[in-house]
Every structure is written in C-alpha cells, then in structure tokens.
Amino acid sequence: MQGSLSWLLRFVEGQQLSSLPRQSHRITMLAGLSVLNLFPLAALEVGQQWYWEIGNLKLHGQTFATSWFVILLLVIASLAATRNVQRVPSGIQNLMEYVLEFLRDLARNQLGEKEYRPWLPFIGTLFLFIFVSNWSGALLPWKLIHIPDGAELAAPTNDINTTVALALLTSLAYFYAGLRKKGLGYFANYVQPIPVLLPIKILEDFTKPLSLSFRLFGNILADELVVAVLVLLVPLLVPLPLMALGLFTSAIQALVFATLAGAYIHEAIESEGEEH
C-alpha cells in the first residue's frame, strides 16, 4: 500500500494525468487529501473491532459494552420512575407514563384493540432500545473513550450485527404470532390468494429482516459519518444543525422499526376479511 501511494505521489509531481483512467484520478485525489492532512481517512475507517474471544467465538466487544450501557440506562430510568409512584405523576414518572401511553397507542394502531396487549412489551422494548441506542451515538462522546486494538465505541445500532439481530427477533416474533394464532394453517397464507405467489411469499420472509436491518444500520452509520466529516472540516457551529437533524432522524428510525414490527405481526395473525 505504501509503494502504491509513493508511486502516486511521484506521478503527481512529475507526470501528466491525462494518460490515467478516471479511477486513477480518484485514487490520486484521495491520496493527495490524505497526505495534506485535510481529510484523515483513517480516522473514519469503519470495521475496526475490539474482539472478545470466548472459545472459538469472536464477539464485538464494543457493541456488547455499549448495548449493556443502553440497557442499564433503561433499567435505571424504569426503577427511578416506579420507585415512589404518585397518584399525580411528576418528573420522571410523568415522562415514563407519557412514553408508555405513546407505545400503547403505537401497538394498538398496528395490532388492533384485541391483539395489542401481549405484544406491547416486545414492540415497546424494540422502540426504547433503538431510540436510546441511536441517541447515545449522537449525544455521548464515545470516541473519547480509549479501548484496546484501536477500536472506537459507537452506538449499538452502528453495528450491522445489532440491527440484524433485532430484525431476526422481529421475524421470529411474527412467525411465532402466526403459528400461535393459526397453527399450521398459518402456512396457508403462502398460497393465498393463488399458489403461484408461493415463491414471492417465501422471498418476503428474507427481504423483511434485510430491509429492517439495513435501513436502520445505514441511516445511523451515515448520520455519524456525515457529522464526523463536518466536524473535521468545519469544527465550529456548522455541524450543530445537522446534529439536531440526526437526533430527529434517529427517533424516526426507532419509530419506523417498531411500527413495521407491529405491522408484520398483525399481518401474521390477521384473519381473512378481518379489518385492521
């Protein structure tokens, strides 16, 4: 790699660029930016991991650490809100009751009055974990905490493994909901209204978790990268509006994920001709 960069630099100094293809132009521009320290590409490298080795398994240590931190925040907030329950709520109890009411309305709107109660804890947990994870990446200075192997802490949802795990949990949830409600008759949905739709219905079972996971991962990663680039280039007040926009989009992503999870579960349990 060093030989390639040295060759590019010598080429820039002593030769013409006209004979190089467009791809070489791009590589030369990026190498020049890196040499001039205007844009430290290595600081934005994605994929440096702090591994925890358990037997033959390698786990992403920073993802587990930040996930446990988010879970701890949620547990502390729940305990603080329920420690001294008042008839007239105030403070954090008032906030948590508002959040509970919001989550209840979200689950009811997706699943209906009769079916939403058993699934409220699942949908609510999804929303709260994703919401707090996203906001932790936007508000907390994770990168100031030094960890081994040169890795950097980030929001749990900044790791594709986290978003895939959440999406697979959602898939298991709507399979379980359908089988619990309809038994083996659930699989009749794959050939309705006509059997020729069977391949498409099977394909949907793969595309649903893929779309859920990559949508969440892509939005959170892109937001953090854009803010990091702007902070490097214009480290004053310019990135602040974009950071505020990032907080808004992070909340929207949590809402979208929880809403789609509820919609998929409702699709699995609804009967033919049943109104939502």
From Swiss-Prot:
<feature type="transmembrane region" description="Helical">
    <location>
        <begin position="225"/>
        <end position="245"/>
    </location>
</feature>
<feature type="transmembrane region" description="Helical">
    <location>
        <begin position="61"/>
        <end position="81"/>
    </location>
</feature>
<keyword id="KW-0138">CF(0)</keyword>
<dbReference type="InterPro" id="IPR023011">
    <property type="entry name" value="ATP_synth_F0_asu_AS"/>
</dbReference>
<keyword id="KW-0472">Membrane</keyword>
<feature type="transmembrane region" description="Helical">
    <location>
        <begin position="246"/>
        <end position="266"/>
    </location>
</feature>
<feature type="transmembrane region" description="Helical">
    <location>
        <begin position="27"/>
        <end position="47"/>
    </location>
</feature>
<dbReference type="InterPro" id="IPR035908">
    <property type="entry name" value="F0_ATP_A_sf"/>
</dbReference>
<dbReference type="GO" id="GO:0015986">
    <property type="term" value="P:proton motive force-driven ATP synthesis"/>
</dbReference>
<keyword id="KW-1133">Transmembrane helix</keyword>
<keyword id="KW-0812">Transmembrane</keyword>
<feature type="transmembrane region" description="Helical">
    <location>
        <begin position="120"/>
        <end position="140"/>
    </location>
</feature>
<keyword id="KW-0406">Ion transport</keyword>
<feature type="transmembrane region" description="Helical">
    <location>
        <begin position="159"/>
        <end position="179"/>
    </location>
</feature>
<dbReference type="GO" id="GO:0045259">
    <property type="term" value="C:proton-transporting ATP synthase complex"/>
</dbReference>
<keyword id="KW-0793">Thylakoid</keyword>
<keyword id="KW-0813">Transport</keyword>
<dbReference type="Pfam" id="PF00119">
    <property type="entry name" value="ATP-synt_A"/>
</dbReference>
<dbReference type="GO" id="GO:0046933">
    <property type="term" value="F:proton-transporting ATP synthase activity, rotational mechanism"/>
</dbReference>
<dbReference type="InterPro" id="IPR045082">
    <property type="entry name" value="ATP_syn_F0_a_bact/chloroplast"/>
</dbReference>
<keyword id="KW-0375">Hydrogen ion transport</keyword>
<comment type="similarity">
    <text>Belongs to the ATPase A chain family.</text>
</comment>
<comment type="function">
    <text>Key component of the proton channel; it plays a direct role in the translocation of protons across the membrane.</text>
</comment>
<dbReference type="GO" id="GO:0031676">
    <property type="term" value="C:plasma membrane-derived thylakoid membrane"/>
</dbReference>
<keyword id="KW-0066">ATP synthesis</keyword>
<comment type="subunit">
    <text>F-type ATPases have 2 components, CF(1) - the catalytic core - and CF(0) - the membrane proton channel. CF(1) has five subunits: alpha(3), beta(3), gamma(1), delta(1), epsilon(1). CF(0) has four main subunits: a, b, b' and c.</text>
</comment>
<protein>
    <recommendedName>
        <fullName>ATP synthase subunit a</fullName>
    </recommendedName>
</protein>
<dbReference type="InterPro" id="IPR000568">
    <property type="entry name" value="ATP_synth_F0_asu"/>
</dbReference>
